[in-house]
């Protein structure tokens, strides 16, 4: 077991020559960072914890809010990536006190479970398509994707399942985001993973960064048209469906629908509605000021009535996250 935990970790350079691990959900240290029973118990206890926190003196509550690292009412892509790495993979990175504290918290384990489970859903969808259509290229559109660990790790899972499926075809990861730090790091990760001896060596993988505001989704129309013969997957983990308005979600879905192929898929994550979400999670996000949407499955279904997409499958994580895939009606 110790030998497995010591498996080599590839690194990519972030800003200011800082080296960060490339997140690989198949690495033993990532797997060891998930204890689903401990996470479940943490979710059960969180409601009582937040009530106790509310009773604390104001200056202590302010310290706690600052420690949560929320900027502009959301958790940024690179900080989210840090918490997805977990305490073991992030060991050795020079962190401030707040990040050292946060990365060890059981509550952030949910981000790792969410990433892992979404990658499993996406790889299952794509494995079937890649087997059926060996001549077609593969294209990801990752809305608010930041460092795109879900797209990269979906490819890792496909390669581990059947490495021949990725050979001989063009593969694109298109990150559509207003952020530049996350996509830049994702590009450096792909560059490292394509080097000799690394996972993606010999594969034709391109990562494109597209400045994208989801309130103006016109870019999806042209991009999907230019790749009309490709296998296409549009995803948004912790992005559009957790922060976007109804109209933003509808417009993005409809724009992607117009020129994408008949077997295109949409995947993503959303939060349970207020009536059913874990009360501790609800209390915590409101306490620290995260402007998240409690869309819920019924909310998603309501939105889908204004599109030509239908729910294909969904997966729940501890009355907090719902992962889903959509197909064309």
Feature-to-residue mapping (PLM):
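Rossmann-like AdoMet
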Residues: 1-133
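Alpha-helical subdomain
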Residues: 39-72, 178-184, 188-329
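Phosphate/oxyanion-binding active-site loops and adjacent basic polyanion-contact surfaces
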Residues: 107-122, 147-151, 178-186, 214, ...
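A structural alpha-helix within SAM-dependent methyltransferase catalytic domains
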Residues: 119, 155-159, 253-258
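Conserved class I S-adenosyl-L-methionine
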Residues: 133-149
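Conserved SAM-binding loop of SAM-dependent methyltransferases across substrates and taxa
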Residues: 147-167
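Conserved SAM-binding motif I beta-strand of class I
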Residues: 170-178
């Amino acid at each position: 077991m110790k030998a497995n935990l010591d498996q080599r970790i590839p690194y990519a350079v972030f800003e200011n020559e800082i080296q960060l691990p490339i997140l690989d959900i198949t690495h033993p240290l990532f797997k060891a960072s998930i204890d689903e029973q401990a996470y479940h118990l943490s979710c059960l206890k969180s409601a009582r914890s937040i009530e106790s926190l509310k009773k604390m003196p104001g200056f202590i509550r302010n310290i706690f809010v600052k420690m949560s690292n929320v900027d502009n009412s959301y958790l940024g892509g690179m900080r989210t990536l840090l918490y997805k790495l977990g305490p073991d993979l992030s060991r050795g990175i020079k962190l401030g006190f707040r990040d050292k504290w946060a990365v060890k918290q059981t509550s952030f384990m949910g981000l790792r479970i969410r990433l892992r489970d979404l990658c499993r859903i996406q790889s299952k969808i794509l494995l079937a398509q890649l087997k059926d259509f060996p001549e077609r290229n593969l294209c990801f559109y990752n809305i608010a994707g930041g460092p795109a660990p879900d797209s990269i790790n979906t490819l890792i899972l496909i390669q581990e399942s059947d490495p021949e499926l990725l050979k001989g075809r063009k593969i694109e990861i298109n990150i559509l985001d207003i952020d530049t730090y996350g996509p830049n790091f994702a590009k450096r990760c792909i560059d490292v993973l394509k080097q000799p001896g690394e996972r993606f060596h010999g594969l034709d993988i391109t990562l494109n960064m597209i400045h994208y505001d989801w309130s103006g989704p016109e870019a999806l129309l042209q991009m999907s048209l230019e790749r009309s013969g490709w296998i296409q997957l549009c995803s948004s983990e912790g992005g559009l469906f957790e922060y976007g308005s109804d109209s933003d979600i509808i417009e993005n879905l409809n724009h992607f629908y117009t020129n994408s192929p008949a077997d295109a898929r949409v995947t993503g994550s959303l939060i349970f509605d207020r009536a059913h979400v874990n009360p501790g999670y609800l209390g915590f996000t409101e306490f620290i000021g995260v402007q998240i949407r409690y869309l819920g499955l019924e909310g998603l279904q309501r939105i889908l009535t204004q599109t030509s997409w239908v729910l294909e499958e969904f997966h729940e994580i501890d009355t907090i996250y719902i992962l889903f895939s959509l197909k064309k009606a």
